[in-house]
């Protein structure tokens, strides 16, 4: 392993990240909220630390290896969460402990959306903007966004991109060069953000709210500038805009690229994962609206449909916006919605969860095993569309699922040891590991009241979920460090 190479890249990335603390200074000056110094201090500290890390190894030019890439990704996300918390620590309003500041920053960067803050409507606009910006930067992954910049700095980007995007589709090529691939994803991400902000503004939001909510919508993050989330606006048009862009943001960005390049929407209909994703949302919607109408939770079927549609798309895509307190819904609905976050968005999207692709392959593998029981000698391939899936990919999906289950069990037991009840522990961990945000029980209204140890466990779960577990777990493997 080339530690000087890792150190050099870490320093560069930290210096680049410090720049993200300057836009909130502008917001603070525009609104005169008095919080500009918190971001100035955060910028200076982050920049200086990055500079001190980079200077001793600035002439190191060796190519980054795969193992180095994993270390950079894991280390940078931990460091990023720490330094992303700096403005919260330097701020006097709100006044936050180290634990709360790191929790909020990690939640933002991993696009989880769990928060320890309350009374959002009274907080300085610059703080609110910074939270939303953290989610937007984290949405596509700081590393993926930096892949387009690193080659200009003399650093190879391929290994970083592979480490940041694990899973069944990580080797998909949109363009021949990795730099062009990252840039294509960036343009799509930026284009969707601008379109979403404009749509929110047309629907009735002010400019500030439109920009802030477009950040967290396209990032599938769920942070809001108001305690009541999207429900604050009480505007059906705003809700429909949110539903549309949450739905789009949780679709594989590679698929968006193919559709834009070919100028044909047929690719959405032909893609097995996109079809499964849409079918999953449709079936959830039927069940939720049907049960809301059956229990007469709302005065009309229209209200049931609107509330049901919004919460199904928001929770199933792991965004976490709310227009109502879904944890108070009758019967199985709250738990079923939390379960839907385990599936999450499509692979290659900003959504969390295990991903539709993995769940689809697990289902197809289960069907194949049933066929094998009936016809023991038959060769039954697992197929996506007309293409057979390599056995190595299927094995990888099963490996991910097994590790996910074991990790979930261990972390839930750890949360129970902190004194949390079973419902709160289960939903808090599900919301953290799946990068969802809102939970049930004591965390239905926020995470400020849970024990300090539980906050650190949830923050670790957010990081594991954002990097899809293996990227962090590989670092504790004896094989990884053997040579």
PLM feature spans:
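Membrane-proximal intracellular helices of multi-pass ion channels
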Residues: 1-483
């Amino acid at each position: 392993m080339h530690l000087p190479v890792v150190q050099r890249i870490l320093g560069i990335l930290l210096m680049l990240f410090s720049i993200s603390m300057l836009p909130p200074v502008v917001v603070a000056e525009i609104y005169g909220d008095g919080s500009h110094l918190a971001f100035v201090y955060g910028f200076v500290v982050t920049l200086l630390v990055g500079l001190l890390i980079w200077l001793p190894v600035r002439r190191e030019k060796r190519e980054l290896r795969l193992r180095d890439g994993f270390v950079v990704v894991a280390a940078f996300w931990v460091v990023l969460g720490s330094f992303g918390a700096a403005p919260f620590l330097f701020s006097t309003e709100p006044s936050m402990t180290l634990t709360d500041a790191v929790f909020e920053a990690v939640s933002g960067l991993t696009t989880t959306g769990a928060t320890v803050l309350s009374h959002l409507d009274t907080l300085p606009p610059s703080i609110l903007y910074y939270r939303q910006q953290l989610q937007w930067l984290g949405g596509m992954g700081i590393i993926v966004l930096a892949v387009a910049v690193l080659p200009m700095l003399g650093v190879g980007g391929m290994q970083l991109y592979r480490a940041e995007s694990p899973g069944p589709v990580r080797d998909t090529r949109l363009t021949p060069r990795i730099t062009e691939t990252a840039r294509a994803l960036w343009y799509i991400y930026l284009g969707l953000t601008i379109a979403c902000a404009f749509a929110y503004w047309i629907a009735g939001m002010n400019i500030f709210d439109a920009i802030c909510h477009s950040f967290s919508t396209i990032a599938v993050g769920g942070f809001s500038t108001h305690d009541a989330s999207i429900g604050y606006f009480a505007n059906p048009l705003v809700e429909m805009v949110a539903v549309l862009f949450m739905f789009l943001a949780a679709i594989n960005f590679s698929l968006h690229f193919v559709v834009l390049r070919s100028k044909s929407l047929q690719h959405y209909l032909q893609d097995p994962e996109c079809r499964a994703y849409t079918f999953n949302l449709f079936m959830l919607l039927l069940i939720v609206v049907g049960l809301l109408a059956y229990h007469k939770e709302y005065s009309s079927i229209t209200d049931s449909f609107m509330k049901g549609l919004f919460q199904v798309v928001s929770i199933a895509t792991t965004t976490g916006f709310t227009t109502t307190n879904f944890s108070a819904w009758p019967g199985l609905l709250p738990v079923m919605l939390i379960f839907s976050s385990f599936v999450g968005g499509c692979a290659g999207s900003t959504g969390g969860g295990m991903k539709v692709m993995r769940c689809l392959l697990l289902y197809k593998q289960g069907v194949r095993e049933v066929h094998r029981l009936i016809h023991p000698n038959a060769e039954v391939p697992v197929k996506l569309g007309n293409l057979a899936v390599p056995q190595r990919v299927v094995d990888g999906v099963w490996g991910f699922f097994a590790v996910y289950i074991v990790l979930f069990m261990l972390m839930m037991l750890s949360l129970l040891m902190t004194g949390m009840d079973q419902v709160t522990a289960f939903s808090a961990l599900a919301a953290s590991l799946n990068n969802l945000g809102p939970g049930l029980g004591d965390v239905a209204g926020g995470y400020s009241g849970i024990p300090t140890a539980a906050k650190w466990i949830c923050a670790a779960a957010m990081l594991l979920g954002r990097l899809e577990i293996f990227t962090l777990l590989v670092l504790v493997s004896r094989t990884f460090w053997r040579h």
